């Protein structure tokens, strides 16, 4: 899904949805209370967020795994595999699995470290240990109570923050913010804090800053037709503008959108007519029909920490 515009507003519609939001929050609280967390055989680092619609957890999880490898550890990723048909636990094999099997994020994660998809996280953690992991990095799952987390990172998009501060469906929050903050060991703010995220955080909560930067791009000053089916496609479009690209058209689809071959051909033809390159995200690229991939450019990004040593020290203290 795409984040509705009213999730950033405090108008009539969020107020009308307040009863549904209260029911959602109650259901979340009951689930937390009814679940006894399981302690995995190895430490667990959870990279999650407070809102629906994406905040950049996957690139942060990839970076955390890279830092762990630099510290001599053997990380494995654990993911729910949103959008995939396999409940798992299953070890992701990019040569065998497609996004329809395991979801798009796990395919990206599997290029960096062993990756397990599991609806039941404790079973997934056990498989990750069997695969040789001495530390598990959970991509998302801050609200999932089934595993004990040794380090919980709350990732926040500095350009979106916590929206209107309301719980779904009245706003973007997965639960009342204070509950998420209670279980977070640190916050990671991605990009410029234009929504005053820092003010909403407890004074004693460690805060780290990072940005998602293009890597290996040769799109500078090129004509580009951009398309994306992610939580906040505007972030992708703004990244392209900042390169800078000449963005001739943008097409936004729902999060985890499954592309039809005809859909891609229309985009490719529109790009050709505009004398532009069709460009998408890494997450979208793995969801494209295989025959269409050679016709589409992909913009790769990486995490750049304001202070990577602070992140390494935080990891070392917890795992």
Language-model features, listed with the residues they occupy:
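Hydrophobic residues at beta-strand termini and immediately following loops
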Residues: 47, 156, 210, 251, ...
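Short, flexible loop segments at boundaries between secondary-structure elements
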Residues: 254-257, 295-319
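A transmembrane-helix-recognition feature enriched in membrane-embedded lipid enzymes
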Residues: 1-43
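Residue-level signal for inorganic ion chemistry
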Residues: 23, 58, 109, 139, ...
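C-terminal accessory "lid"/substrate-recognition subdomains
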Residues: 2-7, 161-277
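Walker A (P-loop) phosphate-binding motif
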Residues: 29-97
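Conserved beta-strand elements of the Class I
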Residues: 74-78, 154, 223-227
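Phosphate/Mg2+-binding loops and adjacent switch elements
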Residues: 81-83, 87-203
């Amino acid at each position: 899904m795409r984040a509705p515009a009213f999730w950033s507003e405090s108008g009539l519609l969020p107020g009308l949805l307040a009863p549904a939001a209260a029911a959602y929050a109650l259901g979340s609280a009951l689930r937390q209370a009814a679940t006894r967390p399981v302690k995995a055989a190895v430490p667990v680092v959870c990279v999650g967020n407070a809102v629906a619609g994406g905040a950049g957890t996957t690139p942060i999880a990839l970076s955390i795994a890279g830092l762990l490898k630099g510290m001599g550890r053997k990380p494995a990723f654990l993911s729910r595999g949103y959008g995939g048909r396999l409940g798992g636990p299953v070890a992701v094999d990019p040569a065998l699995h497609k996004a329809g099997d395991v979801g798009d994020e796990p395919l990206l994660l599997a290029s960096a470290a062993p990756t397990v998809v599991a609806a039941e996280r404790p079973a997934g953690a056990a498989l990750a240990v069997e695969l040789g992991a001495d530390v598990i990095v959970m991509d998302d799952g801050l609200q999932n109570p089934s595993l004990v987390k040794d380090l919980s990172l709350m990732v926040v998009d500095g350009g979106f923050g916590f929206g209107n501060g309301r719980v779904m469906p009245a706003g973007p929050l997965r639960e009342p913010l204070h509950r998420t903050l209670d279980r977070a060991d640190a916050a990671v703010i991605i990009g410029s804090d234009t929504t005053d995220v820092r003010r909403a955080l407890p004074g004693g909560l460690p805060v780290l800053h990072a940005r998602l930067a293009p890597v290996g791009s040769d799109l500078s000053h090129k004509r580009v037709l951009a398309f994306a089916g992610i939580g906040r496609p505007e972030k992708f479009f703004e990244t392209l503008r900042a390169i800078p690209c000449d963005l001739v058209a943008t097409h936004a689809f729902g999060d985890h959108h499954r592309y039809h071959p005809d859909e891609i051909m229309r985009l490719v033809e529109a790009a050709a007519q505009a004398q532009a390159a069709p460009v998408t995200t890494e997450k979208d690229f793995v969801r494209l029909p295989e025959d269409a991939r050679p016709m589409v450019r992909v913009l790769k990004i990486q995490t750049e920490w304001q202070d990577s040593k602070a992140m390494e020290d935080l990891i070392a203290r917890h795992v």
